[in-house]
């Protein structure tokens, strides 16, 4: 096999490859609608919005009111932003870069 991945690691890699193969927003909607429950999709969207707000310097109280998410979840997201692998920050910066192309000129 040569890749060094076994069992669940290979399964996870294959799922990430499936996500990376999606080319349009419609494909994403269709894939995630089949893969996840409405609640799971909503939870992911809330976490991403909370991460954006944390990166923008918003307080926990502001985030709770705007996103209707628990302070425990906000705290976990904040720990990921501060000490994690950088996934939230990198993804949010990429999305913001595509939404505001003038900033890159």
Q: What is each PLM-predicted segment?
A:
Residues 15-22:
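Short, charge-rich, low-complexity alpha-helical interaction segments
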Residues 26-46:
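Short, Lys/Arg-enriched anionic-surface-contact patches
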Residues 44-58:
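Short, amphipathic alpha-helical "recognition" segments used to contact nucleic acids or chromatin
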Residues 57-64, 86:
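Short helix-capping/linker segments at secondary-structure and domain boundaries
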Residues 62-67, 74:
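Short alpha-helical "recognition helix" segments of helix-turn-helix
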Residues 71-94:
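C-terminal structural segments of small proteins and small subunits
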Residues 91-105:
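Intrinsically disordered, low-complexity basic tails/linkers immediately adjacent to helix-turn-helix/homeobox/MYB/SANT
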């Amino acid at each position: 096999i040569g890749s060094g991945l076994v069992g669940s690691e290979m399964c996870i890699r294959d799922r990430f490859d499936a996500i990376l193969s999606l080319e349009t927003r419609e494909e994403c909607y269709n894939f995630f609608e089949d893969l996840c429950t409405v609640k799971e999709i909503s939870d992911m969207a809330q976490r991403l919005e909370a991460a954006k707000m944390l990166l923008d310097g918003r307080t926990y109280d502001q985030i709770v009111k705007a996103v209707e998410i628990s302070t425990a979840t906000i705290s976990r997201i904040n720990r990921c932003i501060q000490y994690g692998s950088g996934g939230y920050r990198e993804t949010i910066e990429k999305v913001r870069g595509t939404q505001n192309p003038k900033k890159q000129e």
